[in-house]
A protein has these predicted regions:
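Short, structured segments at the rim of ligand-binding sites
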Residues: 1-168
Length: 168
């Protein structure tokens, strides 16, 4: 115990799928962002974002986020912009930096979104969106700010509390 020796190791930390999802989301709103360095053999639950993005493009899917809860805000945003979405496994959204389901509902409704938040499910209907008439609130949550920033790139507007992204 007292005479242990530390041996250096060299490891490469793989890219973060959760943060990559926010960047890749710009492409669904007619942007052009290249996301590089993601390992397809990753064990990160958030790597399913690419599959979920494809499903959001095609129809109003039901997506289980119980093992990738950090994707909740960006999937809610895309669901509003595309074809709607039913997210299940959402109860852990309430115990993050903010109650992410409620925070996204409040902010996305400023765009005209129609969202129902249940205990473990979020339902977002496809409705026309518009530029928000008021300043959005980042809810002191970096993932809320990042998801809203993607949508604001399409509609314009402002976010208060954007400094929360410094965590990312």
């Amino acid at each position: 115990k007292g005479r242990q020796t530390f041996t250096n190791i060299e490891e490469v930390v793989e890219a973060d799928y959760s943060n990559a999802a926010f960047l890749d989301a710009f492409n669904l709103l007619d942007g052009f962002v290249k996301v590089k360095g993601l390992k397809t053999s990753s064990y990160q639950g958030d790597k399913r974002y690419k599959k979920y993005f494809k499903e959001l493009e095609e129809n109003m899917p039901t997506l289980d986020i119980s093992n990738c809860v950090d994707l909740g805000p960006i999937l809610m945003m895309i669901g509003c912009f595309k074809n709607g979405v039913v997210l299940t496994g959402t109860k852990r959204l309430a115990i993050k930096e903010s109650n992410r389901a409620i925070a996204m509902k409040e902010e996305l409704e400023k765009f005209g979104a129609k969202i129902d938040v249940g205990e473990n499910k979020v339902i977002i209907e496809k409705v026309p969106l518009h530029k928000p008439l008021e300043i959005l609130d980042g809810h002191n949550d970096h993932r809320i700010v990042m998801a809203l920033a993607v949508l604001l790139s399409k509609f314009g507007g402002k976010i208060s509390g954007y400094e929360a992204v410094n965590k990312s």
